[in-house]
UniProtKB/Swiss-Prot annotation:
Required for efficient assembly and nuclear export of the 60S ribosomal subunit. The gene is LOC1. GO terms for biological process: intracellular mRNA localization; mRNA transport; ribosomal large subunit biogenesis. One of its GO terms (molecular function) is mRNA binding. One of its GO terms (cellular component) is preribosome, large subunit precursor. Component of the 66S pre-ribosomal particle. This is 60S ribosomal subunit assembly/export protein LOC1. It is found in: Nucleus, Nucleolus. Residues 7-16 have a biased composition (Basic residues). It comes from Candida albicans (strain SC5314 / ATCC MYA-2876).
Amino acid sequence: MAPRQSKTAKRNKTQNKTRTVDSEVFSDSAAKNLLADQPKLTPKSKVKKISKLALKKQQAKIRLYGAKNGKEYREDQLNIPTLNKAIVPGVKAKRGKKGKKFVDDNDTLTMNRLVKSINDKYDQVNESKLEKSRRLEEIRDLKRQEIERKEQQKKDKLEGKKDELRSKASVARSTRRKNAKARRADEESQEQEEESPKKKKKVSFV
């Protein structure tokens, strides 16, 4: 007769058979908490997987009626990168930075205004309210002078155009008058020629 096994021996025998290696994440509570804080790196697919029955039905419909055309997308939905466009002859594309304004070398007014407005953020670190108000007043005054100068330039341009048109009109008027005088003189000379009697030829016999 075989010797009887004790309960502890039996337990050890069964435990050895079913022993598994568990990760520290599940056994250690601190590691478990760290894992809980990690974000889900791979998002779940939103498209549901269709069942086998639905797939069979879909395939049968395709066999009977043919496959449907897929969804049509517009160009702006496809995120296609813009390619180099063809150059249109005669059209000159603008080059350079957008909104870039060049200042003339002799334009002291604009230069002063720009310098004062650029240094604005550096000057306001340690300045009194009186100094700040004085500086802002200077900037406003320079801007006002710039606006007045622009308006004056517009007026001068308009006046120049008007003078040009007036001179053109006066030249055209004088040429018209000259042509009219010449025409009148020609008509008068023709009338005189018609009125003067034609000389008769005289024949003398000896």
